[in-house]
């Protein structure tokens, strides 16, 4: 009888320890290095697994190497759930932030004002909305103000880009804003808008995948001319870059396995 009681006590303690261990398990969040998702995760004291892109953050969750991912709501809408690249993942109701997207140019660059005018014209004539519908982001689209009709400086970035004949756009693989189609061509809401800007400038366009954490260095070193990749307009970005008007609403959301 004593042996039986001892065995039952041991089993009870074992189950208690297992339950405690499960309760105290730390959730690991996959985030893109240098992103708004990483910033909010660090602010909340979450344990994180920083990766190169938000697409890789989803891969981490899908592979079981991270418990959850913090990504942009616009990407979650395009990549997560039934009929998407990740049908076994779900976007939870947990919304960590609400934010705005904008493009970033070199500090003091007149390219930002040029892009603003192009976006204003594209919004007014319906082109911007048509592109948004194509990529399913029409509900996030922000109304653009009237064009200012700003005149680029003779020695400014617009003249520099026109002189070299190519607009170099810094991006990451980030559907539905920038991603490759079946032919390996870059498409997406941001990519298509950037193509319109290049056309208005009278230059070719080149998309360059960048390390998101080094985007400001890439700009300042003139490796790229603009960051146009679902960039959140944080105080840090506004201080480091000449940013365009906001054009899309966004949020940081949590994605897990279903």
Positions of predicted regions on the chain:
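Positively charged n-region of N-terminal signal peptides that target proteins for export
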Residues: 1-9
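C-terminal motif of bacterial Sec signal peptides marking the signal peptidase cleavage site
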Residues: 16-19
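Pocket-lining segment of extracytoplasmic ligand-binding domains
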Residues: 25-88, 108-109, 232, 245, ...
């Amino acid at each position: 009888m004593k042996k039986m009681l001892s065995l039952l006590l041991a089993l009870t303690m074992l189950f208690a320890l297992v339950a405690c261990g499960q309760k105290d398990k730390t959730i690991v969040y996959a985030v893109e290095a240098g992103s708004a998702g990483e910033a909010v995760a660090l602010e909340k004291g979450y344990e994180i697994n920083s990766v190169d892109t938000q697409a890789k953050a989803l891969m981490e969750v899908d592979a079981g190497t991270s418990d959850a991912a913090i990504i942009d709501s616009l990407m979650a809408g395009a990549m997560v759930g039934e009929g998407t690249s990740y049908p076994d993942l779900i976007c939870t109701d947990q919304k960590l932030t609400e934010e705005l997207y904008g493009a970033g140019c070199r500090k003091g660059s007149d390219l930002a004002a040029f892009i603003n005018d192009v976006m204003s014209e594209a919004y007014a004539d319906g082109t911007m909305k048509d592109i948004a519908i194509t990529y399913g982001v029409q509900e996030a689209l922000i109304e653009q103000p009237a064009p200012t009709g700003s005149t680029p400086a003779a020695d400014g970035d617009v003249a520099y880009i026109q002189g070299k004949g190519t607009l170099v756009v810094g991006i990451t693989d980030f559907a539905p804003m920038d991603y490759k189609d079946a032919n390996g061509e870059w498409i997406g809401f941001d990519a298509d808008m950037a193509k319109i800007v290049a056309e208005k400038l009278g230059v070719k366009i080149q998309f360059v995948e960048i390390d998101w954490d080094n985007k400001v260095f890439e700009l300042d070193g003139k490796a790229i001319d603009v960051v146009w990749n679902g960039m959140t307009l944080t105080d840090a970005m506004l201080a480091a870059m000449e940013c365009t008007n906001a054009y899309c609403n966004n949020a940081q959301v949590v994605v897990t396995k279903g």
